[in-house]
Amino acid sequence: MSGHSKWSTIKRKKGANDAKRGKIFTRLIKEITVAARGGGGDPEGNPRLRSAILVAKSENMPKDNITRAIKKGTGEIAGEVYDEILYEGYGPGGVAVLVECMTDNRNRTVADIRHYFAKNNGNLGEAGCVSWMFEKKGLILVDKATITEDELMDQALEAGAEDVVEDETEFQVLTNPTELDAVRGAMEAAGIAFVDASISMLPKNVVDVTDEKVGKNLLRLLESLEDHDDVQNVHSNFDIDEELMEQLAE
């Protein structure tokens, strides 16, 4: 099974715990703030902000929190200034890892990220060392139990999607990154429910992980990165057997 897909499933399952600790809200507030700073506070004219607000609402973030984050981004009220940084490196087994961060202290963040890589038999690399192995896509996940592949394919392509890929429990609807918001809106209008919708970095090729020790170190690295307050998203290109993945995820 694709480790990228499986890891996404694990992240969503642990998301309930993250929400209790406020991590999801913290990440969403950062995204809204940065989106508003870069493209203005009007979601109608700022697709990134519009997308961030939709995600925040799906996580039941209070409207006041959303409004305050937008105003911080536009400078109407005082707030932290976050830098967006993409860190790249290799995890155990030669797995490529991308780490998207938003931070108010670059030195602190890079020191922590480098430590996580080194601690788990990986190494933080230079800019561009692995990003070429990934392709930016809009990704909409749909539960297979809610719709047939043929029906979804017809609806998704009509909505402007590029392709539909089947996985163990989900369909992955792929879009041009700039078309994600439009495709998602068209699918919603057609009554298609989805599990998640986001801009993602999809691997062009995958690295097979068959060794249990390598797998443990890899998951520990990914979990450490995901749990860091400055990390927004983590992408990797590993592929792993379903049985081994289940053992490691326990």
Swiss-Prot record:
Record's keyword terms, sorted: Cytoplasm, DNA-binding, Transcription, Transcription regulation
GO cellular component: cytosol
Domain of life: Bacteria
Localization per Swiss-Prot or TrEMBL: Cytoplasm
Gene3D superfamilies per UniProt: 1.10.10.200, 3.30.70.980
Main location per the UniProt record: cytoplasm
Keyword Transcription belongs to the record: yes
GO biological process: regulation of DNA-templated transcription
Gene Ontology terms for molecular function: DNA binding
Family under the similarity heading: Belongs to the TACO1 family.
HAMAP family with a match to the protein in the record: Transcrip_reg_TACO1
Protein name: Probable transcriptional regulatory protein DP2908
Organism, as annotated: Desulfotalea psychrophila (strain LSv54 / DSM 12343)
